[in-house]
């Protein structure tokens, strides 16, 4: 109970100060007062097919490959982080691609970001290789049915299906994101790199640079940028310099192919003290 209260207090203080600690708690906070997002999340969380794929994603990634978490917790973290990045960019005057291109409105953009982020890793249920392609193929089977429960207009449901599939396919660092929404999902995927995500493979005996560098990351926060041209600032607090590998090789590659790289900067801290500012 004390641990729960402490976590809740940290999240609340961070939100009040304009800082958001990357954790599973973000998602619940970001959908408050948004019926469309709340409905969509409830459908996803109760959908047997979706939850089975997310469970199997961890069987494949964590148990068989000794990778870090790619299951339900990671999905919630990325979905919440993506909504936070979107809100920062909206507050800075950015127009979502979905709005600009006449596909939907701002709330539809939020839904695409949340669902794309939540579902981005389901392809790992089949195999890590080409999981972004497999994930899009799997999601194409059930997304229209889910969206038809939310939208009365079937054409809009299919248009938003395509946008969500683009987010899933584009989250791989080798694929360029072509929408603001997909770029945000990709960056949000990269910010889930704190030590908690690496605990499972580490406990199973994985001691490579990926595991050790992830264990060096103490916490990650998403905040408003200090400079006008970089509205999104990702603050990464490390125990030691090993964490730079995570920033450059994991997060950095995501940012570079996100199509929003010029609006994002990463501030690396070492035990709370300024260490380096990185722009990709």
Region locations from a protein language model:
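N-terminal glycine-rich anion-binding loops that anchor highly charged ligand groups
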Residues: 46-57
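Secondary-structure capping and boundary motifs in well-ordered enzyme cores
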Residues: 70-74, 104-111, 131, 160
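Post-HEXXH active-site segment of zinc metalloproteases
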Residues: 130-140
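Active-site alpha-helix of zinc metalloproteases
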Residues: 112-116
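Short, positively charged and aromatic/hydrophobic N-terminal segments
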Residues: 3, 7-18
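Inter-helical turn/loop segments and adjacent helix faces that build the functional surface
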Residues: 145-157, 175
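N-terminal low-complexity or amphipathic/hydrophobic leaders
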Residues: 57-77
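Divalent metal-dependent phosphate-bond-processing catalytic cores, especially two-metal-ion Mg2+/Mn2+ enzymes
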Residues: 17-46, 64-69, 80-107, 119, ...
